[in-house]
């Protein structure tokens, strides 16, 4: 039995929960939270790893490899979108009459376990903003729970099971998964032309964000400078507070200054009064918006401006968000999750401002549909670095599309380098990078492995 419709008593009626693919970063926070709430958790995965080791230390019974025996005696089975429909454990659960639930649906149930669920949405900036809000609440002693799309060093992982009343959740719009949540407070950072292979049009994408906003129980926080976001907000009969730089939001960054190359500070104006000063410890003008969202939510939740400023000053970034890996031939090697042209532009412009002699970008295009649909935008943005190294497209969930290739992309970018593998990309950097360069790997696939190869000789 696949659980899709909401049943408010679902988690009241189960005790033993089994997670297929328990080593995944998306599963781990849910396992932490449910284990802390007293559920008997088991799991399985095909490979060992740091997450599985952490789960075992928590007392979770983890089996390496999938077997029908793993689900015997459990009350519910959780699976992610990455699990094949013919998975032996999923089929066994079906034959035994054990309810099965997809990870994003379970996350919706988990969001209802807390008095205040703070759900952060937007095409860009979700992980950073979710991490900033979690950092602020954590440093303020609120002990929040969290489910984040990247690793936050402060909490040593992708989430945590706190004892407080708050849970901070990264709300992803892919395949409408954020519509399974029940936000008490919600954030809409921006709405951009991504996942149109699923939605079909910007109109449908904006309608999904409208539905998400309408599900918010108390207050919506929206980016006043993002036209698509405000197009949605103007159609709502809901309580909305806004933040921005250019427009007069309820929370506004004024007197914005670059205190060192690529790093910004600003005065926080709440309505008509400057209430404090915020200095960011992460580079990039785009992070001002993420910090404003954090300030807006946390001020509403009862934190002081000083506590927000402390969080901004102490937050050094989340995993795979302009994360420094080390050096290669004296060049600094950084990895970033950017995979949409808007994100690439923000990240590359930030990198340009840092004062390095050359910027080398190693980009792994992600999905054929996105690469084809936004081809001209990718071409334009990949002209920003001094050298663009292009790897093969990572198709992920999509079948191969011979009409779109990395070679076609590279052919439109003067001076670009086309490689056939991550290993070849790393080798090219090892042979050509030099002191004074900044090398940045870009993409939401496994491009980070190339960064690790580049710095391996220096570790």
Regions found by a protein language model. Give the residues of each.
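A short, basic/flexible loop-to-alpha-helix module at the beginning of a structural domain
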Residues: 1-13, 67, 107-109, 323-324, ...
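Nucleotide phosphate-binding/pyrophosphate-handling subdomain across enzymes
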Residues: 2-3, 10-18, 26, 33-37, ...
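Phosphate-binding loop of NTP-binding sites
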Residues: 8-10, 33-39, 53-56, 70, ...
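Conserved N-terminal Rossmann-fold NAD(P)-binding element of oxidoreductases
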Residues: 17-22, 442
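Glycine-rich, highly charged phosphate/nucleotide-binding loops
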Residues: 56-72
């Amino acid at each position: 039995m696949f659980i899709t419709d909401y049943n408010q008593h679902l988690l009241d009626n189960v005790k033993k929960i089994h997670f297929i693919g328990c080593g995944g970063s998306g599963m781990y926070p849910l396992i932490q939270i449910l284990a802390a709430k007293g559920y008997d958790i088991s799991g399985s995965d095909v490979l060992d790893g740091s997450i599985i080791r952490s789960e075992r230390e928590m007392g979770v019974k983890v089996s390496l490899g999938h077997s029908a025996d793993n689900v015997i005696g459990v009350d519910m089975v959780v699976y992610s979108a990455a699990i094949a429909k013919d998975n032996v454990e999923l089929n066994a659960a079906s034959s035994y009459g054990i309810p099965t639930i997809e990870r994003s649906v379970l996350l919706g149930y988990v969001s209802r376990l807390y008095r205040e669920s703070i759900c952060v949405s937007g095409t860009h900036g979700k992980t950073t903003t979710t991490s900033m809000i979690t950092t602020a609440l954590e440093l303020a002693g609120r002990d929040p729970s969290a489910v984040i799309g990247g690793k936050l060093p402060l909490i040593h992982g992708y989430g945590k099971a706190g004892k407080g009343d708050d849970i901070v959740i990264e709300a992803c719009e892919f395949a409408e998964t954020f519509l399974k949540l029940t936000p008490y407070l919600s954030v809409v950072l921006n709405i951009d032309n991504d996942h149109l292979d699923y939605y079909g049009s910007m109109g449908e994408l904006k309608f999904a964000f409208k539905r998400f906003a309408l599900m918010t129980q108390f207050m919506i926080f929206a980016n006043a400078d993002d036209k698509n976001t405000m197009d949605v907000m103007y159609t709502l009969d809901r309580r909305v507070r806004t933040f921005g730089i250019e427009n007069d939001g309820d929370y506004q960054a004024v007197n914005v200054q670059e205190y060192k190359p690529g790093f910004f500070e600003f005065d926080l104006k709440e309505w008509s009064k400057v209430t404090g000063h915020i200095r960011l410890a992460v580079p990039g003008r785009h992070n001002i918006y993420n910090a404003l969202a954090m300030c807006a939510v946390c001020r509403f939740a009862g934190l002081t401006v000083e506590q927000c400023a402390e969080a901004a000053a102490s937050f050094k970034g989340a995993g795979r968000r302009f994360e420094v890996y080390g050096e290669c031939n004296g060049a600094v090697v950084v990895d970033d999750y950017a995979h949409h042209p808007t994100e690439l532009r923000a990240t590359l412009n930030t990198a340009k401002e840092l004062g390095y002699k050359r910027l080398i970008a190693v980009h792994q295009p992600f999905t054929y549909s996105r690469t084809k649909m936004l081809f001209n935008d990718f071409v334009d943005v990949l002209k920003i670095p001094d050298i663009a190294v292009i790897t093969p497209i990572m198709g992920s969930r999509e079948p191969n599309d011979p009409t779109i290739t990395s070679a076609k992309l590279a052919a439109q970018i003067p001076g670009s380098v086309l490689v056939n593998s991550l290993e070849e990309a790393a080798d090219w950097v090892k042979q050509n990078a030099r002191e004074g360069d900044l090398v940045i790997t870009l993409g939401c696939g496994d491009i980070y492995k190339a960064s690790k190869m580049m710095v391996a000789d220096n570790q």
